[in-house]
């Protein structure tokens, strides 16, 4: 008997209550967080870790390649667990073998490595929704094709995607059971239809990693199953970090030409006067599991299977629960409207109604956000704010280039142009030529709850829904041309990137260079291992590193305001001189540094005392590096600031007047040559300026929304120049600077062009005096 909607909802809410009841005990790490990145990995329960720890301290497990009692115990447990995992996926051990691998990608690579050693190689076709790891197989193939849904259907109808279908070369067809980008699911019977429909030997590779996160995988019909299935267990259980390649025994021949062999996979090796070896032949996994298996991870898998069932029941229960939550999330995001009626979210995932059409989708909702005027909201800005509010989501290309290109309408030439313009995976350049380059992905898992969905929808509505009825943006009232209307309240430089600022003494002349204020962000701290420039975003104690310029002694004096051991020096001095002897030799092998995703060639100090000072106070192995003005090539950077969407009204020549205004330059376009403005180690522009009236207004808004919170100090914005009205009786409108095209400063009327609003990251929530984070304020 079919359940009614009310009955289904009742079951779903009861199951949700069950999950809610175990969250605090089993997932204490989720307290204060809303975790919505289960498609990446799911959190692990406390009872699993407790059980694993007990297992490890109660038994002695040896290397399974030995004959000792501890080794035989490991071997027996591994084989029992191998069988248990096959049964978990309804795979008959007489029809399938399971090979333990590091993750799904390792399983994919194992298949590709085997097929490329075939006498004539192999041809490869893959679905456009494939994960990057599936796409990479094309580099090993003789020929490769990317297929969309229609092209797969044509193939199933009898048309081989490769021109010459009489060749003996085998074909490998790969596709995801579920897209990791939007949750769309693809027919598992494609594997059977492809194999039966063609004249060439065709193998099928199913990427089940995204599907098995929250749904059962049924391999009970061996003849209809894929030849190779890959998955990662940490996506199901959170722990252990382990994957599997499940091979249909009828397809084992694909590995016959594999050349490499590792320890434990051979019965005999001759290497002195002859080169010969005898691979193990009883089971395929014995030939493919090179070296010592991750014994402890496999044993942890046994505990993971037990605990998961105890907590959540069957995978069908998990699938039903996550489908219920996913439909709720999708529907509520779809219904969000701005005050003018425009949709807040553009959704790319299939809607819950597709289940009625014979399709299905996983618990993944991918979308982008538009403001009330239709402009795209930056993914980087969404992720930064989400991080501040305790949400864990995924943004960007999510390792699915074909799915992203299809959803966003990105042609290959556009993606190449974006790359040439500086777009890279992980950078903040997420809107290029008016189009987003990625998506926001929220994915749900077994321990997700209705309250998680409620909180996330409320977050989107609070920060991105414009409830005002009028879609028009109120233009600022033109101000009279009065260069004395403002004065500089304070001026600061930040000699070491992401560390405390140095306030320029009042009345002091200060040089303005093409790269910005002299000495500003000329030094940085880089991680010894990666070369990545350190930032307060990850290392908030950098706010307690206080640089001061001492021109009389020619030194940069650096002190630390935090707690230190008694023997640790509290201050160190660094010469301002660029004497080459201070730095590591350019000829020595050293990793280049990275700042905001850019590769730079900075000069790292050779002094152990200097580098140890910073490493000790931060607890991070780091080096002090210098990036002086006037460099070339990788010793030079350029501004990336640009007008934000809310400032596009500034593009016409008729801009509002501003203090000491000067005619604006014409807007940049794709065809116009842009002016390349040099910067040192600042994120986007040579100089950052704010006004005190805007900070005052921000504090007023914070007080209205959350009374009792401490005021925000202007220091958190880390501005070089803080401006305030010259005459207190002539106030400046808050946020008036958003409408300026530039300012003129000083008796000589030095011109400063406004490049764009600063996309300040969540460093604004770090108290610059105490290094404490206060995410609730902003």
From Swiss-Prot:
Where is the segment annotated Disordered?
576-596, 654-673
Q: In which pathway does it act?
A: Cofactor biosynthesis; molybdopterin biosynthesis
List, for all copies, the residue spans of the domain called MOSC. Answer: 651-778
Tell me which InterPro entries the record gives. Answer: Aminotrans_V_dom (IPR000192), MoCF_Sase_C (IPR005302), MoCo_sulfurase (IPR028886), MOCOS_middle (IPR005303), PyrdxlP-dep_Trfase (IPR015424), PyrdxlP-dep_Trfase_major (IPR015421)
Q: Which GO terms describe its biological process?
A: Mo-molybdopterin cofactor biosynthetic process
Name the family: Belongs to the class-V pyridoxal-phosphate-dependent aminotransferase family. MOCOS subfamily.
* Name of the molecule in the record: Molybdenum cofactor sulfurase
Organism per entry: Chaetomium globosum (strain ATCC 6205 / CBS 148.51 / DSM 1962 / NBRC 6347 / NRRL 1970)
- The protein's gene is named hxB
